[in-house]
Design a protein with these regions (language model features):
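Small/flexible residues
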Residues: 38, 47-49, 63, 212, ...
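Alpha-helical, hydrophobic structural elements that either
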Residues: 8-9, 30, 61, 75-370
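Disordered, charged N-terminal biogenesis/targeting segments of membrane/secreted proteins
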Residues: 1-54
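Internal signal-anchor transmembrane helix that establishes type II topology
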Residues: 47-81
């Protein structure tokens, strides 16, 4: 596993560029159809989705994430074979613009082939997909014809992050729900490229083999103080590629039941991978959310915390800690028996070697992983 993880790090930090290939797509139509479909496709039971409070990443814009939280049936090709109904706009895109670009799997990483789009002097290339059955990370390269455009960016921080974000959407055919965040990095301030990274958690168990559709509108500068958000470059850039990668999930040998503040938690699935940790569980309490005012009250927040703040802590052999207890994103579904199904995920702040994990705490239980 250590060798594979070293390969992940090398692939992410030393990405090679695919050859430029312009794609005319109709995904702006697909996006509109996708949002309209979701407005009428809410399930009878309440499904709640909450974003991770991740300190090291820039969250996707709230309006765009809200549109992607509950995804109606969609897709073509491989998705149709598994019973997922296609959106009409997606069918038009596939008919008139051709099928999705292929993605080959090399060293467990998905590598979209010739998947790029150029507009207004910027080429966006989908370079890599890394993931497991519950989370995925997509890495894009942004190549600027005019290097001076990047002079408007603030200096990168110690991790290479810059004060900019991508305004856009991405969904995968058949995805029932997704949440996540993104960031832009400048790994080499002397060249003409940036790296755009999307980290997402999904409610659907597996999306491998389906079609990913990215509609990226613009690259914006983060506001400072009272400054308004301004565009660095306007697109759009549309890309469509097969969602292929090797599932890197490892099952965590956690007991069937753990305790959380006096509540019984039944663990249905617990996995860890180089990209993060995921737990699906049922807890014998429900959240009482009073959303009439449009604001989250302290009582409602405490009620949500009572179902979602299950301790979720990963300790590495070198002492590093990934703590997703109160900052991770989660999906929840109320059940008629007064319990709640919760799917909680925590994407790691960096790609990790699972062989270097010493222990994992879930609820009141610590599992030795050494």
């Amino acid at each position: 596993m250590s060798k594979a993880t070293d390969e992940y790090r090398r692939e992410l930090d030393e990405l090679t560029f695919s050859s430029e290939s312009k794609h005319r797509m109709a995904n702006h139509i697909a996006e509109a159809g996708f949002i309209r479909a979701n407005l009428t496709a809410m399930p009878a039971r309440r499904r709640t989705s909450h974003l991770a409070k991740h300190p090291a990443r820039i969250a996707l814009r709230a309006a765009l994430v809200a549109a992607a939280l509950v995804i109606a049936a969609g897709g073509t090709g491989a998705a149709m074979a598994s019973g997922v109904l296609p959106l009409p706009a997606d069918l038009l895109s596939d008919i008139f613009d051709g099928p999705a670009c292929d993605t080959e799997v090399i060293n467990r990483i998905g590598r979209p082939i010739n998947t790029s789009c150029t507009n207004n002097g910027v080429t966006v290339t989908a370079d890599a997909i890394i993931g497991d059955r519950n989370m995925y990370t997509i890495v894009y390269t942004l190549t600027f014809e005019d290097r001076s455009t990047l002079d408007r960016l603030p200096a990168p921080d110690a991790n290479g992050h810059v004060g900019a974000f991508m305004d856009g959407t991405l969904y995968v055919d058949g995805e029932r729900g997704a949440q996540g965040s993104s960031h832009i990095r400048d790994l080499d301030p002397t060249d003409n490229t940036l790296q755009y990274v999307e980290q997402m958690s999904v409610e659907t168990s597996s999306l491998v083999g389906r079609t990913a559709r990215a509609h990226l509108d613009s690259i914006k500068l983060m506001p400072t103080g009272t400054d308004e958000v301004v565009n660095l470059v306007t697109g759009p850039w549309d890309l469509k590629f097969k969602f292929n990668f090797e599932d890197t999930s490892i099952d965590i040998p956690v007991p069937e039941n753990v305790d959380f503040d006096g509540a019984t938690v039944k663990i249905e699935e617990a996995t860890v991978s180089p990209v993060g940790i995921s737990v699906r569980y049922n807890i014998n309490r429900i959240a009482h959310v009073d959303g009439e005012s449009g604001k989250m009250s302290d009582r409602a927040q405490a009620s949500l915390d009572a179902i979602s703040n299950l301790p979720l802590i990963v300790i590495f052999k070198d002492g590093r800690i990934e703590n997703g207890t109160s900052r991770s994103g989660f999906f929840s579904v109320d059940r008629k028996d007064g319990t709640t199904d919760v799917h909680k995920t925590w994407p790691f702040t960096q790609i990790c070697d699972t062989d270097e994990i010493a222990s994992i705490q879930i609820g009141d239980t610590i599992i030795d992983m050494a």
